[in-house]
Amino acid sequence: MGKYVLGIDQGTTGTKAIVFDRKANIVSSAYSEFTQYFPQPGWVEHDPQEIYDVSMRVVKEALDKGGIDPNDIDSIGITNQRETTVFWDRRTGRPVCPAIVWQDIRTAGRCDELIAKDGKGIVERTGMIIVTNCAAPKIEWVLKNLPEVKAEVDAGNVIFGTVDSWMV
């Protein structure tokens, strides 16, 4: 059984890695920010590869600071930045387009259309309210606006999810 638990807080502006001992004491930690992109008003994007690289760097730094052998990590917990949406090649694990951040409001018009058409019904069927920070309208936006990504999704080569599912 490992001696430590690693927590990764992959947040909206940076990533923190914290190593805890078996008594929940913090042994070591590391943090680093990554780049925010604002290509248009209301749009917020991240480079998923940069998120991954920063995350791996802070994990290594936290382990090094604590003098911890990676084999002594018993489990890893990941928390992430809400509904930020990543599309990646299932064969390589590489992202195929920028991540659309949960704060991004490019899907506001589409969300308004869905609410007007069947907002109450959607909530009743799914338990989810229709808002721009959810992944579903972001996924639809990518599939409608990035034909090269849609073609790869249709071919079964590209999959999508939130940051935590991609990092795992």
Please identify what each model-predicted range represents.
Residues G2, Q10-T12, K23, I122-V168:
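Gly/Ser/Thr-rich active-site cleft segment
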Residues K16, I51-S55, T107-R110, K138, ...:
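General structural feature for long, well-ordered alpha-helical segments within catalytic domains
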Residues M1-C97, E124, K144, A151:
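N-terminal glycine/serine-rich phosphate-binding loop of ATP-dependent small-molecule kinases
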